């Protein structure tokens, strides 16, 4: 059976200074025989005084006591202000009833608490046994009235019996509360002092982030960059640091972050420039090496002691890579025209940067002054398959001999056009020689022209077709028909192919002969009679 008992609250005693404030609690009591028989649990509670005995100060924070220290979150309070407030109002705190407890007093206080609890439990059991007289339980209403009277008289009896225990308990609880308050005050002050630097630093960082100035982008003007470069060169590109550069520049609007960022970009750009300069220097060095090697070869081929100003200049000047395979106009104008070139001949194509036939290698880099007796070698242009074999090149290059004169008749085109009434004619000096029209495709396939070094192959030449003549010009139409008629050589070649391979179909443009034409041709040849089988086969 549970019975209501009163317990003393240490906090209430500390606030009021004297006893008298109680807290309602439930203390287990030994069951009586009547209760065991009836199996009824009785709670003796005084409804009129219940609210007065309950202490609501500890109900806000469950599972904690008010003197346990810092339970609520710590606020930004300066410990010095808190101590000054406590020192200014000493009357608010209750005066301590006893002095500070010694080392052995906590154990004695704990023993006194246990004795008080045991005495209270024994007194409650004795009172319950004395009240029970073995009579049957009263009616419900009467039982409720007796319970009220008993609950009202019970606190007075407990106060009378446990007077000495209450004094000891109040003294012990007062001392414990004062010591606990001192301990809780000191850890709170320590917590304030420990957390103040971190909280102040966090508040300072928050203030800087919220109220601080935003990063301003620096406009690096040419003058500002010039001063930056001067400072970097003064310190050295490898030893320059942002702080020293900022000191040397002496500009207040710049920060160390701006200098560090610009220094990184400057070093990267300078690295790329140095790489490009190194590459250009390597190319220049290679050109100088090639020029020196060419000059040494020219001196060795020329005989040694002969060194003129042109050779010295060529040895010093760097070699320039040619961009096209043809000489510039001013170089072509310096070469005089030949006095008497052979017909159907022209000078060979000169590639810029390469020596020409019949000229010493020393003149390739810097040609000597023109001499009236020196004539550039001339080679035939067309047709190539009729030209005699040229002399060996090493002898001509090494000794500078001129090739033997060639009969111009060997280069004449042995053709006669009856319609145009022209034949082989001599070419007057100074007449430009151009390549003739392309031969038919069949001729090109059967007689391919061998490639000539320095000359563009024939298939690369694209003849420009003549413009179409007007409809009323009969002479122009006749001329066009004559040009479109195949030549005799091409017809003979096609007929020869047909006679060699009669089983193949006739090429385009050839038709089988008719019977009348064959018979007339046979009569012309002196064959008057033709057997019928041959005529049938021919038909």
Curated annotation (Swiss-Prot):
GO annotation, cellular component aspect: nucleus
Give its localization. Answer: Nucleus
Q: Name the PANTHER family for this protein.
A: TRANSCRIPTION ACTIVATOR GLK1
Protein name per Swiss-Prot or TrEMBL = Probable transcription factor GLK2
Gene Ontology BP term (one)? positive regulation of DNA-templated transcription
Keyword field: DNA-binding, Nucleus, Transcription, Transcription regulation
User: Which residue positions does the secretion signal occupy?
Assistant: none
Q: Known Pfam families for this protein?
A: Myb_DNA-binding
Which ranges of the sequence are annotated as binding DNA? 242-267
Major localization class? nucleus
């Amino acid at each position: 059976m549970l019975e209501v008992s009163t317990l003393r609250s240490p906090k209430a005693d500390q606030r009021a200074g004297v006893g008298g404030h109680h807290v309602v609690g439930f203390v287990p009591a030994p069951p009586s025989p009547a209760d065991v028989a009836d199996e009824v649990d009785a709670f003796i509670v005084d409804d009129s005084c219940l609210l007065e005995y309950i202490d609501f100060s500890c109900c806000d924070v469950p599972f904690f006591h008010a003197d346990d220290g810092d339970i609520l979150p710590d606020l930004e309070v300066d410990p010095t202000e808190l101590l000054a407030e406590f020192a200014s109002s000493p009357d608010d705190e209750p005066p301590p009833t006893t002095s500070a407890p010694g080392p052995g007093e906590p154990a004695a206080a704990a023993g006194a608490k246990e004795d008080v609890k045991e005495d209270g439990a024994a007194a409650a059991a004795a009172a319950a046994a004395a009240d029970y007289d073995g009579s049957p339980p009263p009616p419900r209403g009467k039982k409720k009235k007796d319970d009220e009277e008993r609950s009202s008289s019970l606190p007075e009896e407990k106060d009378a019996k446990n007077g000495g225990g209450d004094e000891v308990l109040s003294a012990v609880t007062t001392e414990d509360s004062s010591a606990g308050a001192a301990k809780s005050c000191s850890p709170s002050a320590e917590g304030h002092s420990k957390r103040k630097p971190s909280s102040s630093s966090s508040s300072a960082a928050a203030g800087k982030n919220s109220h601080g100035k935003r990063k301003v982008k620096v406009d690096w003007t040419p003058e500002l960059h010039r001063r930056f470069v001067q400072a970097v060169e003064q310190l050295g590109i490898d030893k320059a640091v942002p702080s020293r550069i900022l000191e040397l520049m002496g500009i207040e609007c710049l920060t160390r972050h701006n200098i560090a960022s610009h220094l990184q970009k400057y070093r990267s750009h300078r690295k790329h420039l140095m790489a490009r300069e190194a590459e250009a220097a390597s190319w220049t060095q290679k050109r100088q090496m090639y020029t020196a090697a060419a000059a040494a070869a020219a001196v060795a081929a020329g005989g040694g002691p002969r060194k003129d100003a042109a050779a010295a200049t060529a040895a010093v000047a760097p070699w320039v890579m040619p961009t096209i395979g043809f000489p510039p106009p001013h170089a072509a104008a310096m070469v005089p025209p030949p006095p008497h070139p052979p017909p159907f001949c022209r000078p060979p194509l000169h590639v810029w940067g390469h020596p020409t036939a019949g000229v010493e290698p020393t003149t390739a880099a810097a040609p000597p002054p023109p001499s009236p007796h020196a004539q550039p070698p001339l080679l035939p242009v067309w047709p190539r398959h009729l030209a005699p074999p040229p002399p060996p090149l090493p002898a001509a290059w090494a000794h500078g001999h001129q090739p033997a004169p060639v009969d111009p008749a060997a280069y004449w085109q042995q053709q006669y056009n009856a319609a145009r009434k022209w034949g082989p004619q001599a070419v007057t000096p100074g007449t430009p020689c151009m390549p003739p029209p392309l031969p038919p495709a069949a001729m090109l396939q059967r007689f391919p022209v061998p490639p000539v070094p320095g000359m563009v192959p024939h298939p690369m030449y694209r003849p420009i077709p003549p413009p179409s003549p007007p409809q009323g010009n009969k002479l122009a139409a006749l001329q066009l028909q004559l040009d479109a008629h195949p030549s005799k050589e091409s017809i003979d070649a096609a007929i020869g192919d047909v006679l060699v391979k009669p089983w193949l179909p006739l090429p385009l443009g050839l038709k089988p002969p008719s019977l009348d034409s064959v018979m007339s041709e046979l009569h012309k040849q002196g064959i008057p009679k033709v057997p019928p089988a041959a005529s049938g086969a021919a038909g």
